[in-house]
């Protein structure tokens, strides 16, 4: 169950979005969840393949609240923190960890390459760098949400959710 204090911290949106978020944690199917996310997280952009590996998280009903908590925080404060810290990823990830109890990291110490993904947006192709990710529940887990801090050309530089699932391996 998502704690009320976390909801109060994150739900600064209008009542309609709050109500939609209340009901999205009750779905038992990732397809249903995917069909609802854009209404619940209006400040996030979801890559067309964001949910391609979501089954790697395990049973939907077991992870839905934690997944939703992460998306709420990224939607409600992620971009604001990124702008506040002048695009300093390290500072933003530290604040997300300490202030919002969101386990996250950027490029790992053993990662030689960047994780890149292309996105089509309004008949244009863009290359995204997707190293930052949150980790569901604990620091040492393969359950992750990979994202990009956004691009000016795509919906006002909103965070782009690129991959939800296990550890990204190319």
Positions of the model-derived regions?
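Basic, Lys/Arg-enriched alpha-helical interface segments
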Residues: 1-142, 150-170
